[in-house]
């Protein structure tokens, strides 16, 4: 049967399932597709084993296994990611390979919160996942309502500990297995529909890139005789129009200038928008005043910084990373958007070294400022070879 084409007339949202191994993330993903396929036709049922053998993808030089399913509710169209292994989650969330606008935290009612439950909540906080909804799975295995209350309380405390609004986050009780096997509808299909209603309501609709303030990383600089300097790149977000005042940020002191022309495929345009590869002509800017690695942006929308806290994943030897651990004062290059900048890594108190395969929170001090904000992704490199990936968790200065 041919794949039905999804009508893109509903707002789009990216979500994923997170939580401890074997708590039922993949079963829940399968159950959502099954229930929506049967009730509203908003999905194609994708069985557990189809999701579980997820294809490998490369993101920022790192191989990650991720399964993607899509479905829609009355209100929204969703792209949903599910990862087979814990390491895949860590890599996925840190590289932003699958951007999450929100996530469903799956907790087994029979086991309660476990180490990876905690770790995924912390990661979600560090990489800036805006909102979580909880699915308390395997409720068919728990007869004692007081035990369910207790697990729910534990989950709320854990969420609050990592700065999520634990008291307000919706928690839906159910059983993905019941939904897949058409048993006890109140724990099965009905619980799944209730969960999706909460996801619709509680996870905020993300702002589209085109509605955000203009930013374009500079990839190349040319001078065109008699016309001035052209910077080229792919517009990351927002819209730029001829006549707009912009700032050039990063590496050097910030300068203001005006856009006097925009071209794409050798044609002149009135504006460029998120996703376009364009050349932007800048008034009165000399070729030697701008360089790859800077950004052109809406004035005041992004500032240059040198010091930040990051959440990073360090590649294993098998993934092409380092063969040995590193220590505090490690000096690799940090690849932001289009360029490498050297930086010094400070490990947290009590951490002696970082092994390949670890994920860790570190402080980084760059030797030159880069236009940055929270959630910005980067690669960690040594001589052009990727040895890790990271995300800016917070800016220090």
From Swiss-Prot:
Residues 61-65 are annotated as: G2. Residues 175-177 are annotated as: G5. Residues 137-140 are annotated as: G4. Pfam families: GTP_EFTU, GTP_EFTU_D2, GTP_EFTU_D3. Signal peptide: none annotated. Residues 82-85 are annotated as: G3. GTP binds at residues 19-26, 82-86, 137-140. GO terms for cellular component: cytosol. It comes from the Bacteria. Its main location: cytoplasm. Coiled coil: none annotated. Residues 19-26 are annotated as: G1. Residues 10-207 form the tr-type G domain. Keywords: Cytoplasm, Elongation factor, GTP-binding, Hydrolase, Magnesium, Metal-binding, Nucleotide-binding, Protein biosynthesis. Mg(2+) binds at residue 26. GTP hydrolase that promotes the GTP-dependent binding of aminoacyl-tRNA to the A-site of ribosomes during protein biosynthesis. Monomer. Belongs to the TRAFAC class translation factor GTPase superfamily. Classic translation factor GTPase family. EF-Tu/EF-1A subfamily. This is Elongation factor Tu. It comes from Azorhizobium caulinodans (strain ATCC 43989 / DSM 5975 / JCM 20966 / LMG 6465 / NBRC 14845 / NCIMB 13405 / ORS 571).
């Amino acid at each position: 049967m041919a794949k039905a084409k999804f009508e893109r007339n509903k707002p789009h949202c990216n979500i994923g399932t997170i939580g401890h191994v074997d708590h039922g993330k993949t079963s829940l993903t399968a159950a959502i597709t099954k229930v929506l396929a049967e009730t509203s036709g908003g999905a194609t049922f994708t069985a557990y084993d189809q999701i579980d053998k997820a294809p490998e993808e490369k993101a920022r030089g790192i191989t990650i296994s991720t399964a993607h399913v899509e479905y829609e509710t009355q209100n929204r169209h969703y792209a949903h990611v599910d990862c087979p292994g814990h390491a895949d989650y860590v890599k996925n969330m840190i590289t932003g390979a699958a951007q999450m606008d929100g996530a469903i935290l799956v907790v087994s009612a029979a086991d309660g919160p476990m180490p990876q439950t905690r770790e995924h909540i912390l990661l979600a906080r560090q990489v800036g996942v805006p909102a979580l909804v909880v699915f308390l799975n395997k409720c068919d295995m728990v007869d004692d309502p007081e035990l369910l209350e207790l697990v729910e309380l534990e989950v709320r405390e854990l969420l609050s500990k990592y700065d999520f609004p634990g008291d307000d986050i919706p928690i839906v009780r159910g059983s993905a297995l019941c939904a897949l096997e058409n048993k006890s509808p109140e724990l099965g299909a009905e619980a799944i529909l209730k969960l999706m209603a909460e996801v619709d309501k509680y996870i905020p609709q993300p702002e589209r890139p085109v509605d955000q303030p203009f930013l374009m990383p500079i990839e190349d600089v040319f001078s065109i005789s008699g016309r001035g300097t052209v910077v080229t790149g792919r517009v990351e977000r927002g819209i730029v129009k001829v006549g707009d005042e912009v700032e050039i940020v990063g590496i050097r002191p910030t300068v203001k200038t005006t856009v006097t022309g925009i071209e794409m495929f050798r044609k002149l345009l009135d504006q460029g928008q998120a996703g376009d590869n364009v050349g932007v002509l800048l008034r009165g800017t000399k070729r030697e005043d701008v360089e790859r690695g800077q950004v052109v942006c809406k004035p005041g929308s992004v500032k240059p910084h040198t010091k930040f806290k990051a959440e990073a994943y360090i590649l294993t030897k098998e993934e092409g990373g380092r063969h040995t651990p590193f220590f505090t004062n490690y000096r690799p290059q940090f690849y932001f958007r289009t360029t490498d900048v050297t930086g010094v890594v400070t490990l947290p108190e009590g951490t002696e070294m970082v092994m390949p395969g670890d994920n860790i929170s570190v402080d980084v001090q760059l030797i030159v400022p880069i236009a940055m904000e929270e959630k910005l992704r980067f690669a960690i490199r040594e001589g052009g070879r990727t040895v890790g990936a990271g995300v800016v968790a917070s800016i220090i200065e």
